Amino acid sequence: MKMNAKFISSYDDYQKCPEITKPEYAFIGRSNVGKSSLINSLTGVKNLAMTSSKPGKTQLINLFTIEETWILADLPGYGFAKASQSSRIKWGRMVHDYLKNRTNLTTVFLLVDSRHEPMKSDLEQITWLASNGIPFSLIFTKIDKQSLTQTNKILASWTKVLSENWEELPKMFLTSSESGKGTEELLTYIDEINKQIAN
């Protein structure tokens, strides 16, 4: 289903982002985790978010309005981006400043590649979000690239690692940008939160 999704603008500082009262959902993950592809699949709008086979394509805070009811924030990835260390530090600071200070931020969706065991950089992001009291959920991407058995194996590994420090695990979604699997569940979750906020 094609949604009414429109690009607002890109920003290199959260303070330059427009003041918006609508609930905002941020998407973040390692470089090349499939973030832009998932956003396009989620909204049904091809090339809404620019995709690239090269890690580090997204370098700014990109805001989109969805159905004129909520805001989607596409944030720079972390990890393998082919950029100088100073640039990566700058991006990291920009993202963390946004996440800590964006007043209408409702939830962060942290994307992880379903083909990989828990990685240090992902776990560090989870720890940082939790320590700063920022609500988040996990989205496992690219489940179409492997068997269901392998996906379940990776999911079990994540559950085991997170259970070592968490009594209640974050909500998890299994998705595929190719088939669209999981996008309906994700949109339903966002819609439920929006209704709770409205009430």
UniProtKB/Swiss-Prot annotation:
Q: Where is the EngB-type G domain?
A: 21-196
Q: Which domain of life is it from?
A: Bacteria
Name its co-factor(s). Mg(2+)
Alphabetized InterPro entries for the sequence? G_ENGB_dom, GTP-bd, GTP-bd_ribosome_bio_YsxC, P-loop_NTPase
Gene3D superfamilies in the record: P-loop containing nucleotide triphosphate hydrolases
Q: Where does GTP bind?
A: 29-36, 56-60, 74-77, 141-144, 175-177
Which molecular function term from Gene Ontology is one that the record holds? metal ion binding
Residues that hold Mg(2+) according to the record: S36, T58
Known CDD domains for this protein?
YihA_EngB
Keywords annotated in UniProt: Cell cycle, Cell division, GTP-binding, Magnesium, Metal-binding, Nucleotide-binding, Septation
One Pfam family of this chain: MMR_HSR1
GO terms under biological process: division septum assembly
Q: Does the keyword Metal-binding apply?
A: yes
The Swiss-Prot or TrEMBL record describes its family as follows: Belongs to the TRAFAC class TrmE-Era-EngA-EngB-Septin-like GTPase superfamily. EngB GTPase family.
Function according to Swiss-Prot or TrEMBL: Necessary for normal cell division and for the maintenance of normal septation.
Q: What is this protein called?
A: Probable GTP-binding protein EngB
